[in-house]
């Protein structure tokens, strides 16, 4: 392997780019790990994160078969062992375009994590590592260009650890190894103090790590006990900006000149405002892996955390050994108490979504209380879990357990991990506290009393309004139903009580025979008759005494009285007598002849429906206005030419009147001029003659007429389009005409698109 000094330029700062992260294909472990493009790092980062959520790797997938034997050998020979120390020399090409078969088992996005997470093994069965332990990791490189931060460092206690491949300020290295001093040339002697200065970590992180390492001396299983130090730096961006400015300033300074300007005068320093040296500005995170400046990690920290636990803890967890838990009142085994957590999860997923969300909120509150009790600095000392389960531990449950507890121990982490990894894997949108609605549900302040009271009052008012409207509609419908029944079955007055037992018996028999007569009489009625307001029908027999005026009509008398149920009517004399006999009851007559008869006792004539013809020559009743020579000179009357013979609406004569154009009505017997500008001609033709201005024809007549036997002879017409009875003549003073029917036909006789028919 090329020494570190060979890749350090004398004019540049020793910090180089971060290691490239593998794409989604390299994560599958079946292909070789190739360097990614620096322009789509964010997209591939999201793909890796989604892939890790849906299908996280585990030792059961046989992807780490070549790695576990080597790591176990190093674990047995060292009490403080890092995963990077057990790496074989075959991983030298990770990050380059040409890699060997051994390096394809690992994706290079896991390499920076190997030095950020430390594991502790039992000190009773292990000894201190020898200096030759780090010799294999000395030749290990995570980038195509050797980085100074990747060099292994020796602490004062003799333990070896590898600093993060990411150029961060809180690295875990303390000093350069003495074994590599002979490789540093005289030309790079001035760069060596800078490298040593950058590798020195803050004191509080070292104390925290030492304190935590001392508390885990008696653990039987490795644990992920601390998050990488650059997570704190990720939360504090100002520190990163200051370091970025310091790095830029050191790179731009001439060779042999320090950052503090010691031993040089102020004249030798380039002024900040000069064009040769521009003031460096803090920038956002750099997603590129080829930049020369300070580079931030481009992979989410959760990926590193989960991958670290998989590499260190799954083998011992599957073997059934006791697992140390930072939470003393919990156990990693309690997630496998019931087998339904694995087999019956899909059946209870929908019904337990709210419970899982509530449980996540309780977990957040409990972690907050534990952190506040411990002053938010150090976690509580771990305790060993109870005896192992009869069957092996579920890797997913142990994985979720350790991930959640490790996240809770990091006081700088924004939000803890969900406790159930199966919910996160199957339904990350609803059950995950990081991505779903749990964070918005459990972390919002509770509404005030005024808001709750206002909301409840508004909801109650809306409910009352809806209930009130429902009651009003029900009352209105019942009123309409009773009004319809009043025409068919009028209530008998209390004064008309039967005077003898025989009459009461006859009334009872009439009520019993009423449904029979109704079912027997329906067969004689045409299909066009509606089923409303109809009770019983009786067809008159064919006799020779019928009048010739009624030969073309079919008259049917319907009576609701008890005395006229079985009686048959024949001829106009019988009809008049029937009406007189049924004066105390309500009855009507249905006829197919569309003729409006005059009221009884009035001298009016019968009014027939206009002749349904499409020829104007048959409809017109006059030959036009009479025009003399003097009137022709004053008012010019024009005769409209080239009209269709079936057009009954267009006037045949027009003139220029005082209020605009006027048209002559050819259907009136005497004829008359009507203003076309003020729609007089339109209303006259539609409502007096029944001619539509759209179809230029007559409206369709009613199918049948229903004449009630009352004082005003109320007449209804059956519409063929809506199949309803339309009042035509009603009221004692109303003129008997078809104007009401024409108004209904103008609105009703249309197709589905609204066109008149």
Swiss-Prot record:
Predominant localisation class: nucleus
Zinc finger intervals, C2H2-type: 717-750
Ranges annotated as biased composition (Pro residues): 379-393
Positions with biased composition (Polar residues): 181-190, 200-218, 253-277, 428-437
GO molecular function terms attached to this record: zinc ion binding
Subcellular location: Nucleus
Disruption phenotype: Results in complete loss of ustilagic acid production.
Inducers of expression: Expression is strongly induced under conditions of nitrogen starvation.
Taxonomic superkingdom: Eukaryota
UniProtKB keywords: Metal-binding, Nucleus, Transcription, Transcription regulation, Zinc, Zinc-finger
Cystine residue pairs: none
Leader peptide range in chain numbering: none
GO cellular component: nucleus
Region (Disordered), start-end ranges: 122-169, 181-218, 237-295, 372-393, 422-582
Keyword match Mitochondrion: no
Compositionally biased region (Low complexity): 125-165, 454-465, 494-510, 543-582
Pfam families, sorted: Rua1_C
ZnF endpoints (C2H2-type 1 degenerate): 661-692
Start-end of Basic residues biased regions: 240-249, 439-453
Function: Transcription factor; part of the gene cluster that mediates the biosynthesis of the glycolipid biosurfactant ustilagic acid (UA). UA is a secreted cellobiose glycolipid that is toxic for many microorganisms and confers biocontrol activity to U.maydis. Recognizes and binds to the specific 5'-T/G-G/T-C-G-C-A-T-A/T-C/T-C/T-G/A-3' upstream activating sequence found in all promoters of the UA biosynthesis genes.
Name by which UniProt lists this protein: Transcription regulator rua1
Organism in which the protein naturally occurs: Mycosarcoma maydis (Corn smut fungus)
Gene transcribed to yield this protein: rua1
